[in-house]
Regions:
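PP2C/PPM-type serine/threonine phosphatase catalytic domain
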Residues: 2-269
């Protein structure tokens, strides 16, 4: 388990960020294989916020190594490579290429580590970058990014067997929730021969929130329960946000969630 927090919850542009996070090993596992990153910096475009969550594969040995190594690589990227990208006229395309290159490199590096030490390991990743009035997301696996405004929206698309079955009309979301294949990933950094990240971009509106979470955070609770606990009308202050996240962690555990549980939340004023 590795968590980097390098934030100051304020910005010099017309947007101000508040952040909260939580992580819990859960009720069954001895090791927390999740890792997370929250970083903030000032740029020519104002305050920039970067959030990443990685879920080391639960049934695979050394999943915490995979998630921590990818988080470390994203941290280095934000410090060393991101400032140069801001000079690109086609920023979105350059960012997508940079992130994709990073994912492919880490996919090979984690796979090589596994071969060297004769272990299976891998990790999901969901990353969110807020720059100016825009957001950018990259996703591999089944960690998620949600947007909370007038209601809750799932921005990322799970790269799982059951989601593919839903997309192709062979399962309903209700059937998928109890399907024994619900944890089977189609994409995983370090355990997939070919990784095809999902890249998203959109405009950031004021008075909204972003929630990044691993699958352990949302297995046993509904999106509506997330919204009712974490919306701006309910969780007003930073302390409220932190308490809301912790409440949902305990709710998951009380409902016998067995996985590690991690979530990050960003409020945009």
């Amino acid at each position: 388990m590795i968590v980097y927090l390098e934030i100051h919850d304020e910005g010099t542009n017309d947007m101000k960020y508040q952040t909260a996070w939580c992580t819990d090993v859960g009720i069954r596992k001895d090791t927390n294989q999740d890792s997370a990153l929250l970083m903030q910096a000032e740029s020519v475009q104002g305050s920039v916020l970067f959030a990443v969550i990685c879920d080391g594969m639960g049934g695979l040995a050394k999943g915490e190594v995979a998630s921590a190594s990818l988080i470390q690589r994203f941290r280095n990227w934000f410090v060393r490579e991101f400032p140069l990208l801001l000079q690109e006229s086609a920023f979105s395309a350059a960012l997508s290429q940079s992130w994709n290159r990073l994912i492919q490199e880490q996919n090979r590096a984690i796979a090589d580590y596994g071969q060297q030490f004769h272990v299976n390991l891998g990790t999901t990743v969901a990353a969110l970058l807020l720059v100016g009035d825009n957001y950018y997301i990259i996703n591999v696996g089944d960690s998620r990014v949600y947007l909370l405004s007038s209601q809750i929206y799932q921005l990322t698309h799970d790269q799982t067997v059951v989601q593919k079955e839903i997309d192709e009309g062979r399962l309903t979301p209700e059937q998928a929730a109890s399907d024994p294949r619900s944890s089977v990933l189609l994409q995983c950094v370090g355990a997939s021969q070919v990784v095809a990240p999902e890249f998203l971009a959109g405009e950031v509106e004021h008075s909204t929130r972003f929630l990044l979470c691993c699958d352990g955070f949302r297995h046993e609770i509904s999106p509506q329960e997330m919204y009712e606990t974490l919306s701006r009308s309910t969780a007003v202050t930073k302390q409220d946000m932190e308490q809301g996240l912790q409440y949902l962690v305990e709710l998951n555990k009380n409902r016998n969630e067995v996985d590690n549980i991690t979530a990050l939340m960003i409020d945009v004023e």
